[in-house]
A protein has these predicted regions:
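Compositionally biased terminal segments of proteins
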Residues: 1-187
Length: 187
């Protein structure tokens, strides 16, 4: 499979060969079966773009329209999703209880499911602040085809931008590895 810039997507499905990823792929399959529109970001997207590595979760950005978020909620119910504790807070101490209404209000959720961890990112300062930001990311997304259906993966440059904004140690490692894997000489 080729990317829009002509470079080969070397990571396509390679992430699936990493031990322990079967559960994570099951999360994607359930999202697809529930017709959830989303973009794959995070470690699985890094693998898709040429640097397969182990990851502990599936990271997605869902399309922000209410119908899609209702479909996402149905998938979350099927997955038995429950919020993880955030820092010193237990799930019951969060300002909004985990519900469809809370999902519709936006925000980010770190969830435990029957197949592993799922992180839902609906807001990221500088990248995901409006519905138009999702549309922009979606316009640069590339397909990833699996036996259970097509997943849209955030584009290479957008992934680099999201990783740069997050700025965690793992994100910086991913950026370097992606650039090496894709022979990208940008700083």
């Amino acid at each position: 499979m080729s990317r829009q810039d002509g470079k080969r997507d070397r990571g396509r499905h390679e992430a699936a060969s990493v031990a322990g990823e079967t559960g994570l792929l099951a999360i994607l399959a359930i999202l697809i079966a529930n017709e959830v529109e989303f973009l794959l970001i995070g470690g699985l997207a890094v693998g898709h773009h040429g640097y397969p590595r182990a990851t502990k979760d599936v990271d997605i950005v869902p399309a922000p329209d209410s119908k899609n978020l209702e479909q996402l909620w149905a998938a979350l119910v099927e997955l038995g999703a429950q919020p993880l504790a955030i820092g010193a807070f237990r799930p019951q101490e969060l300002p909004l209880p985990f519900s469809l209404d809370a999902l519709l209000q936006g925000g980010n959720w770190d969830l435990s499911t029957i197949h592993g961890r799922l992180d839902i990112i609906q807001y990221r300062e500088g990248a995901l602040e409006t519905a138009d930001d999702y549309k922009q990311l979606r316009s640069g997304a590339v397909p990833g085809d699996y036996h259970f259906g097509r997943v849209w993966v955030v584009g290479y440059e957008d992934l680099i931008d999201l990783k740069t904004l997050a700025g965690r140690d793992q994100d910086l490692v991913d950026i370097r590895a992606l650039r090496e894997a894709n022979e990208d000489t940008a700083p």
